[in-house]
Amino acid sequence: MGAAIDPEPAVTHPPHPPPPARRDPVVEVQAGHRIVDPYRWLEAPADDPDVAAFIAEQNAASRAVLAALPGRDALRERLAARTDHPRRGAPWRRGDWWFQVRNDGLQDQDVLWCAPAEGGAPSAAGALPADACFRVLLDPNTWSAEGTAALSGLAVSEDGERVAFARSDAGSDWLVWDVVDTASRRVHDEPVRWARFSGAAWLPDGSGYLYGGYPPPPPGQAHAALARGQQLRLHRLGTDPATDPVVHARADRPEWGFAPNVSHDGRFIVLEVWHGTHPTNRIHVAPRRDGQIGAFRPLLDAGDARYTVLGVLDDDLLLVTDLDAPLGRVVAVDLTDLDAPTPPVLREVVSEQPDRLERVTLVGGSGRDDAAWLVCRRLHHATARLAVHEARGGAYLHDLDLPGAVTVPSVTGGRHARSVHLTVEGFASPVSVLGHDLEQALTSLVTPPAFAAEEVVVEQVRVHHDGVAVPLFLVHRAEVVPDARVPTVLWGYGGFDVAVTPAYRPAWDVWVDAGGLLAVAGLRGGGEYGRAWHDDGRLARKEHVFDDALACAAWLTGQRRDEVHAEVLRGAADPEAVWTAPRHLGVEGRSNGGLLVGACLTRAPEALGCAVPEVGVLDLTRFHRFTIGWAWSSDYGDPDDPDDLEVLLRYSPYHRLEPGRSYPPTLITTGDTDDRVVPMHSLKFAAALQHAQDGPAPVLLRVDTSAGHGAGKPVAKLLDERADVLAFEAHHLGLTLRSDQSPRR
């Protein structure tokens, strides 16, 4: 049975629409361009009286509409059923302890568990302690009554006896680090505040850890102040965090940040020096002798490539890089003479392959005579593939068999291990955990998925237009066939070298099981095909991302067939199929994907049946003035540069709106404590779109309270948000719930 379709969805307006937002134009010349900003006042913090009143009025109107949408409560029930199943991360061992992150289903936050190894063989894949041996080590669900405090960072000492953990509140990027003793579960109560955009790295003796901290922001500006001037600091246990010494900082380069790595033998501190979200970085190294950290030397400092630290093996630093290899390779750098006057020689260990090398895990090699492996995760048309190589010479050993179109979110091992654990998930299957013995090349199932939706079909095509081919996953029930009216959600991101890969999301499952089509696009600007693919969708080429999305929309709706065609990559998809029509097609995306939605909405409103930009970057002239927004200039350009601003104004959704034009039904979402993409983007865009709208379709703004960019949001808030979005899309795209929809429990 296919989807039940309402051929002409009724337009639902707020019974009491909010009053039009006050227009108070600010006119200024920025980088040679005259810009009029009528809603500048909405950039004030969410607790500003005028902004708070605007949010309250908007929420009252949107909640009245969303709560009354047909099937909204049933959708929430089905979302809860899809969410209410046990989930486990990949376990890992340090010293005499095993660790694993778990969730029993509807817990607001994931919980860290631990168990003593009790002499279990670390080389045997899946040789975990009995489940009854595990106990809770950290439960963030006990940290706040509202469930908004999250466990947002973990670092286990080399001997496993201590865990540094980071707490975040209300979805903020700000972290508070502390330490818990594994055996006693005693929390040290030494809160390290004003840290963000950095993990922690333990000293080898467990006496302290390195982290990235910032100067405290001005009072009242914690969610808005610019994030510049990160310092690498050292916290020694038992000391006052306020006195933590600065180990390394660059006052002359306040945009730099430092990701610390301590070699397993303690001889080196290796820094990945990042510059915002720029696709290149630097590597700086300091020797460590007699417990003292020496001066940092620039090892790879040209800023012309990306380097990811894998670890120190013998005397070599192993790195993944795209230097002279746009799809990635593994190289080694000799660290025996850091003061050598000549540039370091990069010795190739694993060469570039036809598929993008996305991530590598170094396992084993704790001693010079110990075997060591590289577990390489590549992307083949946005689907994960795993291969094992010998770490010292790079020789290929074997592949790991993976079940179809999947993602491998994590691979865990250790420098004393001979096996790895990995998590696997797909569009129709939640996370499972596998173990893999690297010596025997044997894979075992440790934790099966909670269920597998066998009635769901996953196909993939490449949509060709303008000489480029864009991968597009098509996810639907087996009985749903192209008939030019299937309610369809097109989801995309297209930025910052982030690959969009198969993932299990309860909301996607509910949509597909109801008879809708989910179309997930791997747009330029993302990380699906390496550096060139990213470069072709950023800066002056950023509009290629929106071209790709609208080409996918055209193929799905049978438009522009003289310009757009498809080839099949996976499954039995028909490249000539017409799946839907514009009024049954919605577009959805988050963060940079929210920009994608806003750009498609303002470019081609007639191509869409609805639009859902979530926590989106929507004012491209002022993003750099708040928190970490300046860092996004790597993809967007600098709004204070005349040439860059000219490009930005061509697609900035807030500035592309045309009063008197008819726009499709739109639901805009944000969180009032979002300090990644501050809420001003969504507030200003909603006010401007409501003012510009000349058609009958509603424009709703939904602002979550005590909620940030998305991470750490409690389950109840997530279920409410997803139910509202699904109900909005179902209503406006013409999808009604099937009475026989499977419970998945």
What role is predicted for each listed range?
Residues W98, V163, Y209-L210, I269, ...:
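Hydrophobic beta-strand positions that form the internal "hydrophobic ladder"
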Residues F134-P140, T182-W194, T239-A251, R289-D301, ...:
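Blade-edge beta-strand/turn elements of extracellular beta-propeller
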Residues N103-D110, W143-T148, R167-V176, P191-R196, ...:
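A flexible loop/linker signature enriched in serine peptidases of the S9 family
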Residues Q230, L234-W274:
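Polar, glycine-rich mid-to-C-terminal structural blocks
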Residues N141-L154, A166-S172, R186-D189, V446-N592, ...:
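Cap/lid segment of the alpha/beta-hydrolase catalytic domain
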Residues L523-R745:
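Active-site-proximal cap/loop segments of hydrolase catalytic domains
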Residues C114-A117, D178-T182, L226-G238, I283-R288, ...:
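Beta-propeller blade signature
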Residues P49-A155, A166, W256-R288, Q292-V312, ...:
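Non-catalytic accessory segments flanking enzyme active sites
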